[in-house]
Amino acid sequence: MNRPSYVTDDRLRHFISEAIREDVGDGDHSTMASVPANMIRRAHLIIKDDCILAGVDLALEIFRYYDKDLKIDVLKKDGEFVKKGDIAFEVVGSARSILTMERFVLNCMQRMSGIATYAHDTVKLVEGTITKILDTRKTTPNFRMCEKWAVYIGGAQNHRFGLYDMIMLKDNHNDYAGGITASVTSTVKYLKEKGKDSTECSLDIMDRR
């Protein structure tokens, strides 16, 4: 499955390096204290529940970033429906590297697969209609790229990535601006000043009962 445009090499490297810094710090002392440095082992990622698999591509990047000598054999790809007991991939190499990256990889894949599965199931509910399922900015701080990537893998659509790539006026904007007319008028003026010659409007109808 192709990556969405916002999953860039730079973003991946930044995300992975920061996560490793947070978790590993100056070293995985439990592993270094108990596992020989030259030990080679084989590990399998076994699926624990039926789901839409997500995070395999990310897992490969994580393993390669930490230890380029690890060998990974992918058996299931992102977006595939997998069943309990299936093996997603196999990793062969330094036992220390595998153990140190194990939880980081599992955390990402568990969360991403859960999101992808929920997105897939929700899209199925509106299949055959004109309704589109979009995500939001209500994401985990510093994990947005991965969560939106999971939505994409699950078959739903990504909305704006951040505050910078799309204007979306909500009730708070309208209240502070003095009403929806004032808010929209000011926004149109702002866009013209910025050299934007077109706008897209959408109407959200919500049951506030």
Residue ranges of predicted features:
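Acidic/glycine-rich phosphate/pyrophosphate-binding loops and surrounding catalytic core
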Residues: 2-209
